[in-house]
Amino acid sequence: MKAIILHGGAGTRLRPLTFSGPKQLIPVANKPVSQYVLEDLISAGISDIAIILGETYPDLVKEHYGDGSKFGCDITYIYQGKPLGIAHAVYLCKEFVGNEEFIVYLGDNLLQHGIKKYLEQFLNGNYDAFILLKEVEDPTRFGVAEFDEKGRLVRLVEKPKIPPSNYALVGVYFFKPVIFDMIKDLKPSGRGELEITDAIQMLLDRGYRVGYAIVEGWWLDTGKKDDILHANALILDERIKRSIKGEIVDSKVEGRVTIEEGAKVENSVIRGPAIIGRNCLIKNSFIGPYTSVDEGSQIIDSSVEYCVILREAMIRDVDRLEESLIGRYAKIVKKEGRRRALRLSVGDYSEVYL
């Protein structure tokens, strides 16, 4: 069994952060989104994994994951370049996959309970393809499933104006190698891409066995700022434990808070769930629930809540920062004048003076 992680796409909805790195490396709870994907695959027993690289900073992806040995897997890199569709990316992996069954996992998707249960359903059901579905409020943003009166899957429609159901395709697919024969016969869609939904539809039309499962628990497509903040809150709420390894001086740490080695908290209040990364400085500040502060960042004389702060950022003299996504090496500094609550999405190396 092999797996493919899709790590391409321009990430336009997460600009300005994606001007300086791929969207899948944006951290939630101080860990890149695509690392949760990698760990999910490994926990399901898969160790032979390909990462599809796009045009957006492929070297940063290689730098983070290396050959996979530090994560307990073997990683092969395959370059797609321009985003020509999921099916195109999958077809590039034909030689890598060989005759084995495989999983395709979008690198910006998160599943609360992981894929292990669904992998077992795919293997035990002897399906040619197996998809995951989740009921959503606005299915027009996704590929959508249509069923017959007996609940059998009959059609998949990509981002329909009039959805046949509210069941969206989750970004995880299970395939036998026969999918490559379908992709070979595809023509580009109206947006110039080879659509994986069209390839799966071809399987259905030609009588192959395509199964599905309704995902239990939450599923997140972390394509926008609010999605990142929501994912951060959910993961902090579920997975963060109280662990104090840094230095605490004249401060209160309330609830489930992780403070990593080398961090210093001075004359401050931290209320969990929250995580403070290595070598951070929190001084004369309040860190509220659902906040992640990545390594090397400094928060001084400020109040921060429900935020994701990337590494080496500085926030100083800000009365209230909330619902914000702050890039690496960014500076948010209050100079003079009236203080007020702020809501920001600030890219890497930015400087904001208030």
Predicted regions and their residues:
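Active-site glycine-centered loops adjacent to acidic/histidine catalytic or metal-binding residues
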Residues: 9, 108, 135, 224
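Alpha-helix/helix-capping structural signal
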Residues: 9, 56, 177-178, 226
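A structural signal for short hydrophobic beta-strand segments in well-ordered beta-sheet cores
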Residues: 25, 145-147, 212
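Short aromatic/basic micro-patch
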Residues: 27, 173-174, 222
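Short internal beta-strands
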Residues: 50-54, 132-133, 325
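Conserved core of the sugar-phosphate nucleotidyltransferase
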Residues: 112-187
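Left-handed beta-helix
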Residues: 152, 178, 185-354
